[in-house]
Protein backbone atom coordinates (compact mmCIF):
# COMPACT_ATOMS: atom_id res chain seq x y z
CA UNK A 1 0.00 0.00 0.00
CA UNK A 2 1.31 3.42 -1.02
CA UNK A 3 0.03 7.01 -1.15
CA UNK A 4 -2.13 8.32 -3.97
CA UNK A 5 0.76 10.42 -5.26
CA UNK A 6 3.06 7.39 -5.38
CA UNK A 7 0.47 5.26 -7.17
CA UNK A 8 -0.25 7.99 -9.71
CA UNK A 9 3.48 8.49 -10.26
CA UNK A 10 4.02 4.76 -10.84
CA UNK A 11 1.12 4.50 -13.27
CA UNK A 12 2.30 7.59 -15.13
CA UNK A 13 5.82 6.20 -15.36
CA UNK A 14 4.64 2.87 -16.77
CA UNK A 15 2.41 4.59 -19.31
CA UNK A 16 5.14 7.06 -20.28
CA UNK A 17 7.61 4.23 -20.89
CA UNK A 18 5.14 2.35 -23.03
CA UNK A 19 6.62 -0.07 -25.53
CA UNK A 20 3.62 -1.52 -27.30
CA UNK A 21 -0.10 -0.97 -27.39
CA UNK A 22 -2.55 -0.42 -24.55
CA UNK A 23 -5.94 -2.08 -24.24
CA UNK A 24 -8.41 0.04 -22.28
CA UNK A 25 -11.28 -1.82 -20.63
CA UNK A 26 -14.27 0.38 -19.81
CA UNK A 27 -17.00 -0.75 -17.43
CA UNK A 28 -20.76 -1.26 -17.83
CA UNK A 29 -20.85 -1.03 -14.02
CA UNK A 30 -19.41 2.51 -13.95
CA UNK A 31 -20.87 5.95 -14.59
CA UNK A 32 -20.95 7.85 -17.85
CA UNK A 33 -18.46 10.24 -16.31
CA UNK A 34 -15.85 7.59 -15.51
CA UNK A 35 -16.18 5.86 -18.88
CA UNK A 36 -16.04 9.14 -20.79
CA UNK A 37 -12.89 10.13 -18.92
CA UNK A 38 -11.29 6.79 -19.84
CA UNK A 39 -12.20 7.20 -23.51
CA UNK A 40 -10.84 10.75 -23.53
CA UNK A 41 -7.68 9.60 -21.73
CA UNK A 42 -7.06 6.93 -24.38
CA UNK A 43 -7.81 9.18 -27.35
CA UNK A 44 -6.14 12.44 -26.32
CA UNK A 45 -2.98 11.07 -24.73
CA UNK A 46 -2.37 7.81 -26.59
CA UNK A 47 -4.29 8.46 -29.83
CA UNK A 48 -5.99 5.13 -29.19
CA UNK A 49 -9.47 3.83 -30.00
CA UNK A 50 -8.77 0.55 -28.21
CA UNK A 51 -11.48 1.13 -25.60
CA UNK A 52 -13.93 -1.73 -25.09
CA UNK A 53 -16.07 -3.35 -22.43
CA UNK A 54 -17.03 -6.89 -21.43
CA UNK A 55 -20.80 -7.53 -21.62
CA UNK A 56 -22.64 -9.51 -18.96
CA UNK A 57 -25.62 -11.18 -20.62
CA UNK A 58 -27.69 -13.97 -19.03
CA UNK A 59 -30.66 -14.91 -21.22
CA UNK A 60 -32.09 -17.18 -18.51
CA UNK A 61 -32.40 -14.20 -16.15
CA UNK A 62 -34.82 -12.19 -18.29
CA UNK A 63 -38.56 -12.28 -17.69
CA UNK A 64 -41.54 -10.52 -19.27
CA UNK A 65 -41.87 -7.99 -16.48
CA UNK A 66 -38.80 -6.11 -15.24
CA UNK A 67 -35.73 -8.36 -15.41
CA UNK A 68 -33.43 -7.98 -18.40
CA UNK A 69 -30.83 -10.39 -19.77
CA UNK A 70 -28.24 -7.61 -19.57
CA UNK A 71 -27.23 -7.66 -15.90
CA UNK A 72 -25.19 -4.45 -15.99
CA UNK A 73 -26.52 -0.98 -15.13
CA UNK A 74 -24.84 1.10 -17.84
CA UNK A 75 -24.22 -0.81 -21.07
CA UNK A 76 -26.53 1.65 -22.84
CA UNK A 77 -24.36 4.44 -21.49
CA UNK A 78 -21.32 2.84 -23.10
CA UNK A 79 -23.15 2.56 -26.40
CA UNK A 80 -24.05 6.24 -26.11
CA UNK A 81 -20.35 7.04 -25.66
CA UNK A 82 -19.42 4.92 -28.68
CA UNK A 83 -17.66 2.23 -26.62
CA UNK A 84 -18.22 -1.25 -28.06
CA UNK A 85 -18.05 -4.75 -26.57
CA UNK A 86 -14.67 -6.43 -26.82
CA UNK A 87 -14.43 -8.52 -30.00
CA UNK A 88 -12.85 -11.85 -30.85
CA UNK A 89 -10.22 -9.95 -32.81
CA UNK A 90 -9.03 -8.08 -29.74
CA UNK A 91 -9.06 -11.23 -27.62
CA UNK A 92 -6.85 -12.84 -30.26
CA UNK A 93 -4.56 -9.81 -30.14
CA UNK A 94 -4.32 -10.28 -26.37
CA UNK A 95 -3.40 -13.95 -26.76
CA UNK A 96 -0.76 -13.02 -29.32
CA UNK A 97 0.82 -10.54 -26.90
CA UNK A 98 -0.01 -7.44 -28.94
CA UNK A 99 -1.12 -5.44 -25.90
CA UNK A 100 1.57 -4.75 -23.33
CA UNK A 101 -0.59 -2.77 -20.91
CA UNK A 102 -4.17 -3.36 -19.82
CA UNK A 103 -5.85 -0.33 -18.27
CA UNK A 104 -9.10 -1.47 -16.67
CA UNK A 105 -11.80 0.27 -14.66
CA UNK A 106 -14.32 -1.29 -12.28
CA UNK A 107 -14.46 -4.82 -13.61
CA UNK A 108 -12.93 -8.25 -13.10
CA UNK A 109 -10.31 -8.98 -15.74
CA UNK A 110 -11.19 -12.67 -15.42
CA UNK A 111 -14.48 -11.89 -17.19
CA UNK A 112 -12.53 -11.46 -20.42
CA UNK A 113 -12.79 -14.83 -22.19
CA UNK A 114 -9.67 -17.02 -22.08
CA UNK A 115 -7.92 -14.79 -19.56
CA UNK A 116 -5.43 -17.49 -18.60
CA UNK A 117 -4.14 -17.51 -22.17
CA UNK A 118 -3.14 -13.85 -22.30
CA UNK A 119 -2.54 -12.43 -18.81
CA UNK A 120 0.99 -13.82 -18.67
CA UNK A 121 1.78 -11.96 -21.92
CA UNK A 122 0.73 -8.56 -20.55
CA UNK A 123 3.62 -6.63 -18.99
CA UNK A 124 1.67 -4.03 -17.00
CA UNK A 125 -1.82 -3.99 -15.48
CA UNK A 126 -3.36 -0.79 -14.10
CA UNK A 127 -6.79 -1.27 -12.54
CA UNK A 128 -9.38 0.85 -10.73
CA UNK A 129 -11.27 -1.51 -8.40
CA UNK A 130 -13.70 -1.29 -5.52
CA UNK A 131 -13.51 -4.99 -4.70
CA UNK A 132 -10.68 -7.50 -4.88
CA UNK A 133 -10.75 -10.39 -7.33
CA UNK A 134 -8.64 -13.46 -8.02
CA UNK A 135 -6.13 -11.46 -10.08
CA UNK A 136 -5.97 -8.11 -8.27
CA UNK A 137 -2.97 -9.06 -6.12
CA UNK A 138 -0.93 -9.50 -9.32
CA UNK A 139 -1.81 -6.09 -10.76
CA UNK A 140 0.98 -3.51 -11.13
CA UNK A 141 -1.08 -0.59 -9.81
CA UNK A 142 -4.53 -0.80 -8.19
CA UNK A 143 -6.42 2.41 -7.51
CA UNK A 144 -9.21 2.09 -4.92
CA UNK A 145 -12.31 3.20 -6.79
CA UNK A 146 -15.34 4.78 -5.16
CA UNK A 147 -18.54 2.72 -5.33
CA UNK A 148 -21.79 3.96 -6.82
CA UNK A 149 -23.01 4.84 -3.30
CA UNK A 150 -20.10 7.24 -2.78
CA UNK A 151 -20.18 9.40 -5.90
CA UNK A 152 -22.09 11.77 -8.11
CA UNK A 153 -22.68 10.50 -11.61
CA UNK A 154 -25.08 9.23 -14.25
CA UNK A 155 -26.24 5.92 -15.71
CA UNK A 156 -28.42 5.17 -18.74
CA UNK A 157 -31.13 2.56 -18.22
CA UNK A 158 -32.65 0.13 -20.73
CA UNK A 159 -35.12 2.81 -21.87
CA UNK A 160 -32.24 5.21 -22.61
CA UNK A 161 -33.20 7.37 -19.65
CA UNK A 162 -30.21 9.18 -18.16
CA UNK A 163 -30.45 9.00 -14.36
CA UNK A 164 -28.53 10.66 -11.53
CA UNK A 165 -26.86 8.97 -8.62
CA UNK A 166 -25.78 10.89 -5.53
CA UNK A 167 -23.49 9.94 -2.65
CA UNK A 168 -25.12 8.26 0.34
CA UNK A 169 -21.84 7.25 1.99
CA UNK A 170 -18.99 9.63 2.82
CA UNK A 171 -15.41 8.97 1.68
CA UNK A 172 -12.25 10.74 2.82
CA UNK A 173 -12.37 13.01 -0.23
CA UNK A 174 -16.10 13.60 -0.57
CA UNK A 175 -17.21 15.67 -3.56
CA UNK A 176 -19.79 18.29 -2.65
CA UNK A 177 -21.61 19.96 -5.51
CA UNK A 178 -23.18 23.36 -4.90
CA UNK A 179 -26.57 22.95 -3.24
CA UNK A 180 -26.17 19.21 -2.70
CA UNK A 181 -25.07 16.72 -0.07
CA UNK A 182 -25.45 18.98 2.96
CA UNK A 183 -24.45 17.60 6.34
CA UNK A 184 -27.36 15.95 8.15
CA UNK A 185 -28.33 17.04 11.65
CA UNK A 186 -27.14 13.67 12.96
CA UNK A 187 -23.69 14.20 11.42
CA UNK A 188 -23.52 17.87 12.37
CA UNK A 189 -24.42 17.42 16.02
CA UNK A 190 -22.94 13.98 16.66
CA UNK A 191 -21.00 13.93 19.92
CA UNK A 192 -17.46 12.47 20.09
CA UNK A 193 -18.82 9.40 21.88
CA UNK A 194 -21.60 8.75 19.33
CA UNK A 195 -20.50 5.73 17.28
CA UNK A 196 -22.93 6.56 14.47
CA UNK A 197 -21.01 9.78 13.77
CA UNK A 198 -17.71 7.93 13.30
CA UNK A 199 -18.38 5.51 10.47
CA UNK A 200 -15.52 4.24 8.31
CA UNK A 201 -14.55 6.64 5.55
CA UNK A 202 -12.72 4.83 2.79
CA UNK A 203 -9.82 6.40 0.92
CA UNK A 204 -11.32 5.92 -2.53
CA UNK A 205 -11.76 8.18 -5.55
CA UNK A 206 -13.87 8.12 -8.73
CA UNK A 207 -11.99 7.04 -11.84
CA UNK A 208 -12.40 10.38 -13.65
CA UNK A 209 -10.60 12.15 -10.82
CA UNK A 210 -7.61 9.79 -10.88
CA UNK A 211 -7.38 9.90 -14.68
CA UNK A 212 -7.33 13.70 -14.51
CA UNK A 213 -4.33 13.50 -12.15
CA UNK A 214 -2.48 10.99 -14.34
CA UNK A 215 -3.18 13.05 -17.45
CA UNK A 216 -1.72 16.11 -15.76
CA UNK A 217 1.43 14.22 -14.79
CA UNK A 218 1.78 13.25 -18.47
CA UNK A 219 1.45 16.87 -19.56
CA UNK A 220 -2.27 17.07 -20.39
CA UNK A 221 -4.91 19.23 -18.72
CA UNK A 222 -8.42 17.80 -18.54
CA UNK A 223 -9.71 20.71 -16.40
CA UNK A 224 -12.28 18.65 -14.52
CA UNK A 225 -12.96 20.00 -11.04
CA UNK A 226 -16.06 17.92 -10.35
CA UNK A 227 -18.26 15.22 -11.86
CA UNK A 228 -20.75 17.69 -13.34
CA UNK A 229 -18.01 19.29 -15.42
CA UNK A 230 -17.22 15.85 -16.87
CA UNK A 231 -20.92 15.32 -17.58
CA UNK A 232 -21.31 18.68 -19.31
CA UNK A 233 -18.33 17.99 -21.58
CA UNK A 234 -19.49 14.50 -22.53
CA UNK A 235 -23.00 15.79 -23.25
CA UNK A 236 -21.59 18.37 -25.64
CA UNK A 237 -20.00 15.50 -27.60
CA UNK A 238 -23.27 13.55 -28.02
CA UNK A 239 -26.06 14.58 -30.44
CA UNK A 240 -29.28 15.22 -28.55
CA UNK A 241 -27.54 15.97 -25.24
CA UNK A 242 -25.80 19.23 -26.05
CA UNK A 243 -26.17 21.74 -23.25
CA UNK A 244 -27.30 19.23 -20.62
CA UNK A 245 -26.15 19.46 -17.01
CA UNK A 246 -27.24 17.79 -13.76
CA UNK A 247 -30.22 20.14 -13.46
CA UNK A 248 -31.40 18.91 -16.86
CA UNK A 249 -31.50 15.36 -15.51
CA UNK A 250 -33.31 16.35 -12.33
CA UNK A 251 -34.74 13.76 -9.96
CA UNK A 252 -36.75 11.90 -12.61
CA UNK A 253 -34.07 11.49 -15.26
CA UNK A 254 -34.28 12.42 -18.93
CA UNK A 255 -34.56 10.26 -22.03
CA UNK A 256 -32.00 10.70 -24.77
Regions found by a protein language model. Name each.
Residues 247-256:
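Acidic, Ser/Thr-rich low-complexity intrinsically disordered segments
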Residues 21-26:
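Short glycine-rich phosphate-binding loop at a beta-alpha junction
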Residues 239-247:
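A broadly structural signal marking compact, well-ordered functional cores
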Residues 28-30:
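Active-site-proximal loop/turn and secondary-structure-junction residues that shape catalytic pockets
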Residues 1-10, 14-20, 32-240:
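Non-catalytic alpha/beta scaffold blocks inside enzyme catalytic domains
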Amino acid sequence: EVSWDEAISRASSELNNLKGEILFIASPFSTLEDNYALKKFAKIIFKSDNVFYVPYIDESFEDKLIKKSDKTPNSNGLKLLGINPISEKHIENLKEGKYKIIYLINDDINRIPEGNNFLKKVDINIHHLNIKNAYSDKVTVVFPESTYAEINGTFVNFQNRVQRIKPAVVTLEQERLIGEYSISRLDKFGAPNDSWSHGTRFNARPTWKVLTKIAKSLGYEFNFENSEEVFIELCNSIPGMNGWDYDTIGSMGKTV
